[in-house]
């Protein structure tokens, strides 16, 4: 049979912001932003985090603003 070769079934990721009722993403909330940045300092994509497109755009802007204000590093440690 040419199908799935056994393994884990894919689980649908849920948007963190929608499920927790967060409507505004503040660039000064560094603890929240760090959850969506890799250890190398790169912004994690939607397919990894499960964030909706609307909040991914807001998240990207907030992370870039936080980097500009030196609240987040451009590269990881």
Swiss-Prot record:
InterPro entries: Ribosomal_bS18 (IPR001648), Ribosomal_bS18_CS (IPR018275), Ribosomal_bS18_sf (IPR036870). PROSITE patterns: RIBOSOMAL_S18. One of its GO terms (biological process) is translation. The keyword ATP-binding does not apply. One of its GO terms (molecular function) is structural constituent of ribosome. The keyword Glycoprotein does not apply. SUPFAM superfamilies: Ribosomal protein S18. GO terms for cellular component: cytosolic small ribosomal subunit. It comes from the Bacteria. Keywords: Ribonucleoprotein, Ribosomal protein, RNA-binding, rRNA-binding. Belongs to the bacterial ribosomal protein bS18 family. Part of the 30S ribosomal subunit. Forms a tight heterodimer with protein bS6. Binds as a heterodimer with protein bS6 to the central domain of the 16S rRNA, where it helps stabilize the platform of the 30S subunit. This is Small ribosomal subunit protein bS18. It comes from Bacillus anthracis. The lineage of its organism: Bacteria, Bacillati, Bacillota, Bacilli, Bacillales.
């Amino acid at each position: 049979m040419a199908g799935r070769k056994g393994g884990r079934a894919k689980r649908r990721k849920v948007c963190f912001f929608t499920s927790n009722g967060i409507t505004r993403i503040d660039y000064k909330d560094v603890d929240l932003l760090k959850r969506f940045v890799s250890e190398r300092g790169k912004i994690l994509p939607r397919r990894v985090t499960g964030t909706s497109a609307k909040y991914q755009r807001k998240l990207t802007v907030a992370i870039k603003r936080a980097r500009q204000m030196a609240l987040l590093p451009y590269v990881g440690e």
